[in-house]
């Protein structure tokens, strides 16, 4: 069985299918790890989510920020934004089945045999992998429970700007969500800067660094695979971490990384681009 991790698809169904051909994906034997943001900005979000849903256990998918946004829109808690491409999902006859499936996806997946953790965005430096798993399970229980809409109503916002173990209520759950689905930069004390999205080296605010470069982060030494950051160059980084978001929807590449080999193998498909980075 081959295991491939794939970066942010964001509704780029045609490129997704091209990449599956490139890796010779066998639906009966292989497994996909999808780093979140299945939907939005690309033209075929409905086709992507239906296809992944249909793969069943052959696909392991973690939630990204665009996936959570879809849940909030479907719940009537957020309007469709001008750049959203979610209307086809919202009007689909199988809408409720897809939305229910989506909110039951994990926020973090760890394969202990391979020693690899899959997330969408990042981990604050205070979290080791056990803490990250515990926090992910905490929020997943809410999203999968009867009060999932209540969390989504309180999800949006950039504060608190730092993880603390004594956080409670919506602030705690929002911070967990922001770390796992939005985090790119923080400072040496673990304070987040969620608004800044550019590539490393362009920081205008002193002290900011990619989350995986914070000195003495508790998860250092763990192999972590993530997406979310289209302006970060794809590839392995010290840590060790592997960045998979090639910015497909922006005209970059859709990226796959084979994980079950001793030396990871990379695969790329060029994308025509459907939106502009903002």
Curated annotation (Swiss-Prot):
The keyword Hydrolase applies. The keyword Hydrolase applies. Disulfide bonds: none annotated. It catalyses: P(1),P(4)-bis(5'-adenosyl) tetraphosphate + H2O = 2 ADP + 2 H(+). Keywords: Hydrolase. InterPro entries: ApaH, Calcineurin-like_PHP_ApaH, Metallo-depent_PP-like. GO terms for molecular function: bis(5'-nucleosyl)-tetraphosphatase (symmetrical) activity. Its EC number is 3.6.1.41. Hydrolyzes diadenosine 5',5'''-P1,P4-tetraphosphate to yield ADP. Belongs to the Ap4A hydrolase family. This is Bis(5'-nucleosyl)-tetraphosphatase, symmetrical.
């Amino acid at each position: 069985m081959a295991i491939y991790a794939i970066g942010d698809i964001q509704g780029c169904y045609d490129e997704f299918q091209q990449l599956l051909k490139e890796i010779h994906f066998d639906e009966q034997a292989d497994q996909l790890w999808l780093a979140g943001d299945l939907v939005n900005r690309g033209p075929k979000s409905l086709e992507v989510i239906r296809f992944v849903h249909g793969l069943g256990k052959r696909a392991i998918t973690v939630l990204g920020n665009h996936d959570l946004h879809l849940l909030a829109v479907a719940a009537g808690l957020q309007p469709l934004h001008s750049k959203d491409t979610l209307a086809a999902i919202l009007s689909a006859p199988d809408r409720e089945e897809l939305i229910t499936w989506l909110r039951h996806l994990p926020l973090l997946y760890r394969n202990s045999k391979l020693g690899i953790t899959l997330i969408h965005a990042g981990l604050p430096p205070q979290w080791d992998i056990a803490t990250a798993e515990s926090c992910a399970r905490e929020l997943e229980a809410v999203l999968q429970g009867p009060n999932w809409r209540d969390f989504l109503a309180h999800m949006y916002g950039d504060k608190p700007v730092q993880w603390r173990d004594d956080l409670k209520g919506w602030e705690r759950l929002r911070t967990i969500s922001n770390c796992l689905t939005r985090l790119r930069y923080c400072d040496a004390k673990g304070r987040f800067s969620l608004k800044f999205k550019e590539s490393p080296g362009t920081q205008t605010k002193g002290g900011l660094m990619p989350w995986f470069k914070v000195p003495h982060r508790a998860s250092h030494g763990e192999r972590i695979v993530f997406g979310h950051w289209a302006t970060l160059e794809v590839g392995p980084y010290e840590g060790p971490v592997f960045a998979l978001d090639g910015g497909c929807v922006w005209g970059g590449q859709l990226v796959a990384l084979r994980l079950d080999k001793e030396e990871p193998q990379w695969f790329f498909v060029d994308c025509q681009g459907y939106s502009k980075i903002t």
